[in-house]
Every structure is written in C-alpha cells, then in structure tokens.
C-alpha cells in the first residue's frame, strides 16, 4: 500500500470511521469528509487483497475458477 500505510492500519482506521458515522454525531460536512476517506481506504484495502490473491494464485499455480470446477466434479 502506498505511503507506508499497512493493510491492517487501514482496516483499523476504516473501522473507526464506520463507528463515527454510525454514531451520527458528526456534522454533515464531517460525515462527508469521513465517508470520502473511508471509500479511499476501502479501495486501497481491496486493491491490496486483489494483489495478494493474484500472488497466491501465481505461487501455487492455481486459479480460483479451476478449483471451483474440480470441487463441483468431486461432489457429484
């Protein structure tokens, strides 16, 4: 993740933003600012997860679609 922000730190910050928004004590402007920040953090986290998934698939030589197909065949 960019600027040295780690995935776990981003998740923690995102959880705090959700708590603040759920309380409903922020002004409209503060809520919008926090919402925007939360969306940005969520996108970064999703990108990090996608990259990790791709790396795992590359390292293991598997594709999630192939695994699903083989699971379906064995359960029939």
From Swiss-Prot:
The keyword 4Fe-4S does not apply. GO terms for cellular component: cytosol; exodeoxyribonuclease VII complex. Gene3D superfamilies: Exonuclease VII, small subunit (1.10.287.1040). Heterooligomer composed of large and small subunits. This is Exodeoxyribonuclease 7 small subunit. Keywords: Cytoplasm, Exonuclease, Hydrolase, Nuclease. Its main location: cytoplasm. Belongs to the XseB family. It is found in: Cytoplasm. Bidirectionally degrades single-stranded DNA into large acid-insoluble oligonucleotides, which are then degraded further into small acid-soluble oligonucleotides. It holds the Pfam family Exonuc_VII_S. InterPro entries: Exonuc_VII_S, Exonuc_VII_ssu_sf. It catalyses: Exonucleolytic cleavage in either 5'- to 3'- or 3'- to 5'-direction to yield nucleoside 5'-phosphates. One of its GO terms (biological process) is DNA catabolic process. HAMAP family: Exonuc_7_S. It is an enzyme of class 3 (hydrolase). Its EC number is 3.1.11.6. GO terms for molecular function: exodeoxyribonuclease VII activity.
């Amino acid at each position: 993740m960019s600027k040295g922000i780690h995935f776990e730190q981003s998740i923690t910050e995102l959880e705090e933003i959700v708590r603040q928004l759920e309380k409903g004590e922020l002004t409209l402007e503060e809520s919008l600012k926090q919402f925007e920040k939360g969306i940005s953090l969520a996108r970064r986290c999703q990108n990090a997860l996608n990259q990790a998934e791709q790396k795992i698939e590359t390292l293991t030589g598997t594709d999630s679609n192939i695994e699903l197909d083989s699971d379906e065949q064995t359960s029939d």
